[in-house]
């Protein structure tokens, strides 16, 4: 195939799609250029499904090569290793709008790899990767119901910005990524500076409108490339099996969905499934039916039973009305030795969230393609298997945990103080101890309480809520605070976090087409009512940050010295600073501009370290009297330490008004003596006198 190129203007950027020259053995491959940011995105689809495959094995890997930024990786091996958090998040960002566009019965393995090969540090690779994945899949000839487009939206001075640069995002009130087909929005990921629901919805519709040019260009590319439509055909339904299954189940599933407790409901459904499969075992054997297909169709019955019930009755499987939030229980300060903690329970979803305060040096150093930087606000989300009553793998975080942690972090970012306002590194850890839907939003609520319990001066409390949707033709219901089953069996997962003032984070995943602006508007308004209710429940535990830090949290003292004095504080080979930290038990961070931050759980120790540093950096004044310690005896006099790191010479003639034959007769090393500063010469050498003090000359240093 000859090389095909398509170029178009997208916001301020010139975007070019190329195919037919690179990675020609892949099912589909595209080079995406967005100014100087260049990605190779490939899609490979297996010709057939593996034997016994019962799920769609789609894998998405986004990777940033260090050579893209003209850098060599750090570390011993000097090569890229496991995926970074950013790479994992963008991989999920690509996966989410693509997965629902494949047919339900398609089980062939599909792998998408997006490689950043050149990076303009002001243009991120996320939108280019989404566009490239859509184009590569469209070229691959898979049964992909695309293409999709993608756009990033900023908001400043009341206007939306299409595909803002990283520089523009620094003072933007919004960073929102939206992806979708020509007719439907499928995915939204955003963080915002407490904007209204109307502004957020406007950003979604603006992005969807602008991305149409991407979809049109990809369609033109596939036509010019001569891509053949997929020949895959969905397997025919076994109508006899489905009829037999429906007859065997009868009204049992409808009854099971009336059980309000999650675990009891799950057990009831499992028992029905077991009985039904046993009752049909004879026909499975005689008619050659597949047990896997029988299980799949049982799942379809579950799906329709729950959906039909809520659409007909407007009552949910746990007995709630459509807009009712589950009972909430909140406690702050539940762990005595931590710096801040909270227990947040909403129905059968529960999180213990802990805040830890550290110094600037505790920040995480990120070795990124665009350059190294430090992250001083860390948010970690853990989802152990016991939270859903199961046994499972326990160890490094999975992609889902990284994604949920990032969403929860987005939820509270808008209210966090700057490092200048609160010079601590802050780590928040959310331990999900029970889960039945919306655990990421429980993490938002719990983290808000834990931060306030730790005394972090957040601007306002934050709460989060997950919304759902069930839609059949023109009938639909919007569900507040969804359960796990409602998420799994519904058509939309719509998470909103924010304060009473506005939205701080919005995440949306839609599984069907036909979600109108009106439906999204209703979901946002219903979410606002739920969020305000949750904030009211949270206020029963805490309404504002605590005035005092935990007794176990480090206290920070900040002082400023002239940058030229830094070497005096550090000392030769770090000797001075090491001595201060060892003797006072403090941790000291020195910045290039002369800012010194002293950290200690003990306030008295921090003050002692501060005094030592002030002594070291203070200037020695001629005419002043200091109390010092004899450091060294010489034939011609004695060296006396008058301040940490500052020694002066008392010449033998300045020891006493009487004649001194031998210095050792008058002074010993370690003696404490009062000395007057006679002179500080241009080289910084200090001349001292004991004799002048005895004669009553000079002003004591303490007089300062």
From Swiss-Prot:
Mg(2+) binds at residues 487, 493. Residues 623-691 form the S1 motif domain. Its cofactor is Mg(2+). It comes from the Bacteria. One of its GO terms (molecular function) is magnesium ion binding. Keywords: Cytoplasm, Magnesium, Metal-binding, Nucleotidyltransferase, RNA-binding, Transferase. It catalyses: RNA(n+1) + phosphate = RNA(n) + a ribonucleoside 5'-diphosphate. It is found in: Cytoplasm. GO terms for cellular component: cytosol. SMART domains: KH (SM00322), S1 (SM00316). Its EC number is 2.7.7.8. Residues 554-613 form the KH domain. Pfam families: KH_1, PNPase, RNase_PH, RNase_PH_C, S1. One of its GO terms (biological process) is RNA processing. Component of the RNA degradosome, which is a multiprotein complex involved in RNA processing and mRNA degradation. Belongs to the polyribonucleotide nucleotidyltransferase family. Involved in mRNA degradation. Catalyzes the phosphorolysis of single-stranded polyribonucleotides processively in the 3'- to 5'-direction. This is Polyribonucleotide nucleotidyltransferase.
């Amino acid at each position: 195939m000859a090389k095909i190129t398509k170029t178009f203007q997208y916001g301020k950027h010139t975007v070019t799609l190329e195919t037919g020259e690179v990675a020609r053995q892949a099912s589909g491959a595209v080079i995406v250029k967005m100014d100087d940011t260049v990605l190779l995105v490939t899609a490979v689809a297996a010709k057939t499904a593996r034997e016994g495959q019962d799920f769609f094995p789609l894998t998405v890997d986004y990777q940033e090569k260090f050579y893209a930024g003209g850098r060599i990786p750090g570390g011993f091996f000097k090569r890229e290793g496991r995926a970074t958090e950013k790479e994992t998040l963008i991989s999920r960002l690509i996966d989410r709008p693509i997965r629902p566009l494949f047919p339900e019965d398609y089980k062939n393995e599909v792998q998408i790899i997006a490689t950043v090969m050149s990076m303009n540090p002001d243009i991120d690779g996320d939108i280019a990767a989404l566009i490239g994945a859509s184009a590569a899949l469209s070229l691959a000839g898979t049964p992909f119901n695309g293409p999709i487009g993608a756009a990033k939206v900023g908001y400043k001075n009341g206007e939306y910005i299409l595909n803002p640069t990283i520089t523009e995002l620094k003072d933007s009130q919004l960073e929102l990524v939206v992806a979708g087909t020509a007719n439907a929005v499928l995915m939204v990921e955003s963080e915002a500076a407490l904007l209204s629901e109307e502004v957020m919805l406007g950003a979604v519709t603006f992005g969807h409108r602008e991305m149409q040019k991407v979809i049109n260009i990809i369609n033109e590319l596939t036509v010019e490339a001569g891509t053949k439509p997929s020949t895959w055909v969905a397997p025919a339904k076994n109508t006899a099996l489905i009829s037999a299954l429906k007859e065997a189940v009868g009204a049992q599933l409808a009854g099971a969905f009336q059980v309000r407790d999650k675990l009891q409901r799950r057990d009831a459904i499992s028992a029905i499934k077991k009985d039904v499969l046993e009752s049909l075992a004879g026909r499975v054997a005689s008619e050659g039916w597949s047990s896997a297909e029988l299980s799949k169709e049982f799942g379809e019955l579950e799906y329709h039973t729950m959906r039909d019930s809520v659409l007909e009755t407007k009552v949910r499987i746990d007995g709630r009305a459509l807009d009712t939030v589950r009972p909430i229980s909140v406690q702050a300060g539940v762990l005595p030795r931590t710096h801040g903690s909270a227990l947040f329970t909403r129905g059968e979803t529960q999180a213990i969230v802990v805040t830890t305060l550290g110094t600037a040096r505790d920040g995480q150093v990120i070795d990124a393609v665009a350059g190294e930087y430090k992250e001083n606000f860390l948010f970690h989300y853990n989802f152990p298997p016991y939270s859903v009553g199961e046994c499972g793998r326990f160890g490094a975080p999975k992609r889902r945990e990284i994604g949920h942690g990032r969403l929860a972090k987005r939820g509270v970012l808008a209210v966090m103080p700057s490092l200048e306002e609160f010079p601590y590194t802050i780590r928040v850890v959310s331990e999900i101890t029970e889960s039945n839907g919306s655990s990421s939003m429980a993490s938002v609520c719990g983290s808000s309480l834990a931060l306030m319990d730790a005394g972090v001066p957040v601007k306002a409390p934050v709460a989060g809520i997950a919304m759902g949707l069930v839609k059949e033709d023109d009938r639909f219901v919007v569900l507040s605070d969804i359960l796990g089953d409602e998420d799994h069996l519904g058509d939309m997962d719509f998470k909103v976090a924010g304060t009473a003032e506005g939205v701080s984070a919005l995440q949306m995943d839609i599984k069907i087409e036909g979600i109108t602006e009106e439906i999204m508007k209703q979901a946002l308004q219903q979410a606002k009512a739920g969020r305000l209710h949750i904030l009211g429940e949270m206020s029963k535990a805490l309404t504002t940050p605590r005035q005092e830090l935990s007794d176990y949290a480090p206290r920070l003292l900040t002082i400023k010295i002239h940058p030229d004095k830094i070497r005096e504080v550090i000392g030769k080979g770090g000797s001075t600073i090491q001595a201060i930290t060892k003797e006072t038990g403090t941790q000291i961070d020195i910045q290039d501009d002369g800012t010194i931050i002293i950290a200690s759980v003990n306030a008295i120790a921090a003050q002692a370290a501060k005094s030592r540093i002030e002594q070291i950096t203070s200037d020695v004044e001629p005419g002043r009297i200091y109390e010092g310690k004899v450091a060294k005896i010489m034939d011609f006099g004695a060296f006396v330490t008058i301040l940490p790191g500052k020694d002066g010479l008392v010449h033998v003639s300045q020891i006493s008004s009487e004649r001194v034959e031998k210095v050792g007769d008058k002074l010993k090393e370690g003696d404490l003596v009062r000395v007057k500063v006679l002179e500080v010469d241009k080289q910084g050498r200090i001349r001292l006198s004991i004799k002048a003090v005895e004669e009553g000359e000079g002003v004591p240093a303490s007089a300062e």
